[in-house]
Amino acid sequence: MTVRVRGIYATALTRLLREAGHEVVQASGPIEDRFDGEFADERAAVTVTTTDDQQGVGVIGDHDAAAAVTDRLTELGRDTLHWSDPTPEGAIYAGTVTDTLGSGAVVDLGDGEGFLPYSSSDERVETGDTLRVQVVEASAPWTDGRPVLDTTVAVRGSLLSLVRGETASTPGTGGPAMLDLIAAEPRDGWGVSWESASEDASFDALAAALDAANDRAAAIDASLDGADAPEDCAPTRYDEGRSTVWLWFGRESRFALDEVRREVTSTMPGHHRVKAGDRAASAAVDYVEALCDDPETGETDFPFAVTTRQFGPQVGGSLSLGHGKPDGRLITLGNGEVQSVDDDGTVTIEREMSPGGTYDALGVPKEAGDIAETKVKEGRWWYPTVYRDSDGEKKGTYVNVCTPVEIFPDTARYVDLHVDVVKHADGAVERVDDDELDAAVERGHISEPLAERARSVAAAVKSALE
């Protein structure tokens, strides 16, 4: 039996379900990293998804398979409670509109109420209307939400969906050509729509998924063919849909899940208890566990790799240079796009320069199309910026000597120590602004020990560039 698992309980539930002999499929990236062996990208008979409030999970799928998963999960602890949904996902109803709200209508289904967004109906919806609807998103019983409805009848899956009344493959990930590559056809009167996950699935897996969807479509056809029109029978259920069960995890159950997860990866006490409480706290849990999981990083004073993976900066984002001055001012040297983030603490950013004037100490003009590439490294007393023109030709390098760089999620901060080193396009190297450093010492802005450190760094950088 195949199961797809998502949410904050995924690691523990993947372990539990695999031990119970079930095959976990369509695993997320972190799950693939934590477990040995490959996970197939094929149709899931059951999907286990964490609820939006993270208090439990929904188990949705084929009836026998969902029952087996539910039975295993209810064994977690005595405070795991479960309820079958009276308006299960995929169920089809003749319903009566009882109220119209700002964005949709409330529909009496007989088994309960549902919410039909106006965008999910091709026709105008008014109070008193009767119409055929399908549950597309079920709602846990402990929430205030109603199940979400749609007037389009479909067999919805993570690899593909079949839409009743369509006659062709819907353009998308696979498009019509996909049907030429697999050994299956959609049921007559139904069109297939390929989901993004189908890109990673094998042709055999797609064919099997389409066969299963066809079986479900046949059951729907049998329920609807010859059935009374909604105006003659509402409210009533035409088709029972997929098994939908909600499980609430209590405190004991969450701690039991901690123990299971701990068999797979570093897990702090109360992992699931904390994560269930707040999304911000969830991020803190991930951070702490990442520190514990990889202590041998070679980082002696600061866990840079873990911190940036959790909070940034990240490739494609932006990072500014918070250029402090010894007199207490702070100048922001623009934002650059992050090109790379290395575990050793190095972040590379690029900035496009505005034309006009010349580059400090280099004496070359700033021109349209110029690019500045800056490499900052956590804890280093200097950083280089290489200037290139629009053709990629180097115009010069400016090395700023500063207090040790600190790289925060959105800015790299330091205090400029005045003395700098430049390397011209012709290879000439010079040290500049020693007089400004001396003046800052005289004014009391920089201590003599700090100034001596700056001079030592500048000398070492100059020697390395020559």
UniProtKB/Swiss-Prot annotation:
EC number per UniProt: 3.1.26.-
Coiled-coil regions listed: none
Alphabetized UniProt keyword annotations: Endonuclease, Hydrolase, Nuclease, RNA-binding, rRNA processing
Gene Ontology MF, one: RNA endonuclease activity, producing 5'-phosphomonoesters
GO terms of biological process kind: rRNA processing
Residue intervals of the S1 motif domain: 90-152
Pfam families given in the database record: DUF402, S1
Task of the protein: Probable RNase involved in rRNA stability through maturation and/or degradation of precursor rRNAs. Binds to RNA in loop regions with AU-rich sequences.
Family listed: Belongs to the FAU-1 family.
Name assigned to this protein: Probable ribonuclease FAU-1
Gene that encodes it: fau-1
